[in-house]
Amino acid sequence: MQGKKKLSIVVLSYNHQEYIEQALEGIFMQKVDFPIELILCDDKSPDNTHEVIEAYLKNTPPHIEVKYTRHEQNMGSTPNFYYALRQVTGEYLAFCEGDDYWTDEHKLQTQYDFLEQNLEYAICFHQANNVSPYSELDGKPFSIIEDRDYTPLEIYQHWVVHTATVVMRSATLRTLAFKETLNDPTLQYFDTAIFLAATTLGKMQGFSKTMSAYRRHDAGLSFGAVNFRRDLKHNHLDTIIGNFYQGKIKQHSDWQIFIRSYNDFFQTLKQGQFATAFQFLKWILKHYKKLIIYLLKKIRH
């Protein structure tokens, strides 16, 4: 492994006592010919996640350097993510949430080799399967990924890239796109934003092979019942992304915000949540003129 570029893996955990061991097992089983830096950050889980982590880390393979932090105070998912990224020293970067896991022992080597051999690419990802108590989701693909290049607009329009499937160049963290779109600690989501930032460095490749599992459960950050506060934060992120990238991404951003706000406005109104309904109404009024102009231009063409 001497002379090989290092790969950093960011793992965030919170209340993952039932899952974190499987996440670490998927990392430790990787067959690679390069050094690994594991950056594991537990956000002061009130359950036994910390104890499970400490016990499992005793079996760390020799080629993996562990940087484990258990925060003294709960930071929240996004500040915890920013904290973890500041620890990255590898030239490549991978992710695995504490409740997801990798299923293929050659996952990292496959993606590492691709980026080493194809310098024009900055990021690659693969297919993942859902693991869920809901039969309509369990065992099915998170999204259908093809062996081809993907565009920034594609991954923004359609939620196709799951975080645990990605390996990217860590130079992404030094791009203007990263600095401009991922500097707000109140953001609820950060995965799509960092994937888009990577595409400012180079191309993006998809692999059809399934090499990880996405655990979908009600406690997950991006899965569960309708959450109006979450949707307001999603509007905020879409605004940041649209304002930076402009063009078709900006058009889609405006459309997403309008549709989400329109639907949530009527739902909150029916539920008597008038203050929240008013917040969605402000988003609607802010974007409907832009959408009318956009639709008129499209009709003319």
Q: For the regions a protein language model found, what residue spans apply to each?
A:
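Conserved donor NDP-sugar-binding/catalytic core segment of glycosyltransferases
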Residues: H106-G139
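A conserved acidic beta->alpha catalytic loop
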Residues: D42-E51, Q73, E97
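Glycine-rich, basic loop-to-helix element that forms the pyrophosphate-binding segment
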Residues: R70-V88, T110
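Short, acidic, metal-binding catalytic loop of nucleotide-sugar glycosyltransferases
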Residues: E25-P35
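Conserved short acidic donor-positioning loop in nucleotide-sugar-dependent glycosyltransferases
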Residues: N15, I27, D43-K44, M75
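Catalytic core of nucleotide-sugar-dependent glycosyltransferases
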Residues: L187-Y189, T210, Y214-D218, F223-H252, ...
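Conserved nucleotide-sugar donor-binding catalytic segment
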Residues: R86, H126, S143-N227
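Short aromatic/hydrophobic "clamp" motif used to bind/position activated sugar donors
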Residues: L93
